[in-house]
Amino acid sequence: MNLSFADTLYFKKENILEIILGLHRSYKSLQREIQICCELNNLTFNELIVILEIKKGIKKKIDIANKLFLKKQNLNLILKDLQLKNILKLDNKSILITQSGEELIQKTTDRINEKIIKIFKKTDPKNMSGFINIIESL
């Protein structure tokens, strides 16, 4: 039996979120796939990143803005758009993901997960050292 590097990887859901948040800047093919998934689900990339951070447990606007290096007024616009799309529900101090938002994130991360695995199956393991270090640190 001949196993490729991608066959030996095990992607947990929380690791996929970290990969999306951490690697989108360095891997062009991954960046392209994420962009396609965003467009299919009528999201911008910043909206996806904000939703993923909220899903990871960050509930305060200031924490999200600091973590993603967004200006607060930009974050407010993103949150307002997500609320209009019925993805988020904004209370006084908390931000909640709606049921339709949960389904959208599930669908998006599943699709990105499939694409990530396909990309890695095509990639020579010799070129994966940086990625391996990131995966090991998760």
Residue positions per predicted region:
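C-terminal regulatory/oligomerization modules of transcriptional regulators
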Residues: 1-11, 121, 125-138
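N-terminal leader segment of winged-helix/HTH proteins
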Residues: 1-41, 86-87, 94-97, 103
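Residues at secondary-structure transition points
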Residues: 14, 45, 69-73, 92, ...
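N-terminal helix-turn-helix DNA-binding core of bacterial DNA-binding proteins
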Residues: 32-74
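Charged, amphipathic alpha-helical coiled-coil/dimerization segments
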Residues: 80-133
